[in-house]
């Protein structure tokens, strides 16, 4: 990838691990960004994927796309970042980025000065907590405010 292009990091863990919902949103977002923008390079970040993927070959490939995978599962990464609050920046896995986007409710730690973009799709975990597992409600109630 040319060094002069801005590098946009995107957490694509949901795109790899979820067939619908936020996973589909993230896959469509990446496709649309690549189709409509030729000025940026994209560093797609994922936690270690499961053995079986719900969607075969979920991510695009190309000269402006670089996939970086952490050696830990999403469960372990989120425990480190949001339960233990270890400030291990996502750039440890992605390398240098100019912007980081998390499309799935929470941001990982980033290096000081790295701009971030967060998508919070809804607040149903606040308004309808009975429709979620208690563990997920507890996690989101803790992690989302820290990310916003």
Where are these predicted regions, by residue range?
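Carbohydrate transferase catalytic cores enriched for Leloir-type hexosyltransferases
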Residues: 1-148
């Amino acid at each position: 990838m040319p060094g002069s292009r801005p590098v946009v990091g995107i957490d694509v863990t949901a795109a790899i691990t979820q067939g619908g919902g936020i996973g589909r949103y993230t896959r469509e977002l990446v496709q649309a960004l690549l189709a409509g923008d030729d000025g940026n390079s994209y560093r797609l970040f994922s936690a270690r994927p499961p053995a079986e993927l719900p969607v075969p070959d979920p991510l695009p490939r190309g000269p402006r796309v670089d996939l970086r995978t952490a050696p830990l599962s999403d469960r372990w990464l989120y425990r480190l970042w949001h339960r233990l609050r270890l400030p291990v920046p996502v750039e440890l896995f992605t390398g240098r980025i100019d912007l980081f986007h998390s499309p799935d409710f929470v941001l990982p730690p980033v290096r000081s000065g790295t701009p971030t973009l967060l998508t919070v799709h809804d607040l149903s975990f606040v308004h309808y907590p009975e429709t979620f597992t208690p563990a997920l409600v507890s996690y989101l109630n803790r992690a989302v405010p820290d990310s916003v």
